[in-house]
Regions:
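Gram-negative bacterial Sec-dependent N-terminal signal peptides
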Residues: 1-25
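N-terminal hydrophobic or amphipathic helices and topogenic motifs
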Residues: 25-42, 78-79, 83, 149-155, ...
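Extracytoplasmic/periplasmic ligand-capture domains
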Residues: 27-31, 78, 103-132, 208-211, ...
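Extracytoplasmic
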Residues: 36-40, 47, 68, 85-87, ...
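N-terminal lobe/hinge region of extracytoplasmic solute-binding protein
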Residues: 44-94, 124, 212-213
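A structural "hinge/loop" feature
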Residues: 47-63, 86, 134, 181-191, ...
């Protein structure tokens, strides 16, 4: 992934660490480092988002913003490893029953506590066919108890293998042992969502005046096809380590426009997928501002082997 960033935004080192994970989250400022007076970030996000509801999103632009607005049980560190998020610790019994111990100081942006019941509601909502989440199947990857029947409409969402043992203890029961289960929990789809806001505002709960989030940032402004502005969430449990006070996401789809607006000083961070010719040119002209970061991605072929598919039939011996 190719990114261009201005070093003047924050001190060198801190900025590069923030950009590596492609989200403006909290960071430890190295001793002796002097930060710039104005801690704001304007970044291109590649396109207009389809939704800010963690259960309705499926694209990279949406995920970029959701990682700033919402925090799940676990999050990814700078090297892509799962580390504590809302859950400060966790344990399991035979990799089948997992228990997550939530931070007692975790709060929503309105100041109310984030509880285990929030995760029960959120995961049940994710699995519920009525939600029509494109990532409902993600819970199937974790083999949660009863998830297959719930998604198929054979059982109610309340039968999902999740339980709040108390306000700060969330228990998950799987249908079989899954040693890697905790690693799945960095995905945006398993972030908590605010039941009260959803029940009050319905599909409009993600509008700036209605939304409640639990991440390092909260939604300040959303002008469709123009900008989305996030501001620091002072109720976030790790707010003291949040470096950037405001983040503005722009929906610029043209790579050329993206780079031109960066070079004119309108944005601080470009999107990726830069044409090779442009990359080579900029690498020579502004080598200290062009960064190539690892990109975690999986490509695969999915074969349609249904008996009524002509090509599949022709390929059979």
């Amino acid at each position: 992934m190719t990114i261009i960033t201005k070093k003047s935004l924050v001190a060198a080192g801190v900025l590069s660490a923030l950009m590596t994970i492609n989200a403006a989250v909290a960071a430890d400022v190295p001793a002796g480092v002097q930060l710039a007076d104005k801690q704001t970030l304007v970044r291109n996000n590649g396109s207009e988002v389809q939704s800010l509801d963690p259960h309705k999103i499926e694209g990279v632009p949406e995920s970029n913003i959701n990682r700033d607005l919402f925090e799940g049980l676990l999050v990814s560190d700078l090297d892509g490893h799962p580390v504590a998020g809302v859950a400060e610790k966790w344990d399991n019994k035979d990799f089948k029953v997992w228990t997550f111990h939530l931070r007692k100081d975790a709060k929503w942006s309105d100041g109310t506590p984030v509880t285990a019941q929030d995760f029960v509601y959120s995961w049940q909502r994710l699995a519920d066919p009525k939600t029509a989440s494109p990532y409902a199947s993600y819970l199937q990857y974790g083999h949660l108890a009863n998830v297959d029947d719930i998604i198929a409409g054979k059982k109610p969402a309340t039968d999902l293998g999740v339980k709040a043992l108390d306000d700060h203890t969330f228990e998950v029961t799987l249908s079989e042992p899954v040693p890697y289960f905790y690693k799945l929990l960095v995905h945006p789809s398993v972030s908590p969502v605010p039941k009260s806001a959803i029940e009050k505002f319905g599909d409009k709960w993600t509008q700036p005046a209605n939304i409640v989030s639990n991440g390092a940032y909260k939604l300040k402004d959303w002008v469709v096809n123009e900008r989305i502005v996030l501001e620091r969430n002072t109720n976030y449990w790790d707010n003291a380590k949040t470096v950037i006070n405001q983040v503005t996401f722009l929906p610029i789809s043209s790579e050329v426009t993206d780079v031109n607006r960066y070079r004119s000083g309108e944005i601080d961070m470009t999107y990726n997928n830069m044409p090779i010719e442009l990359f080579q040119k900029l690498k020579k002209e502004i080598p200290k501002e062009v960064h190539v970061d690892p990109y975690l991605c999986t490509y695969y072929y999915e074969i349609n082997n249904q008996k009524d598919y002509p090509l599949a039939i022709a390929a059979q011996p």
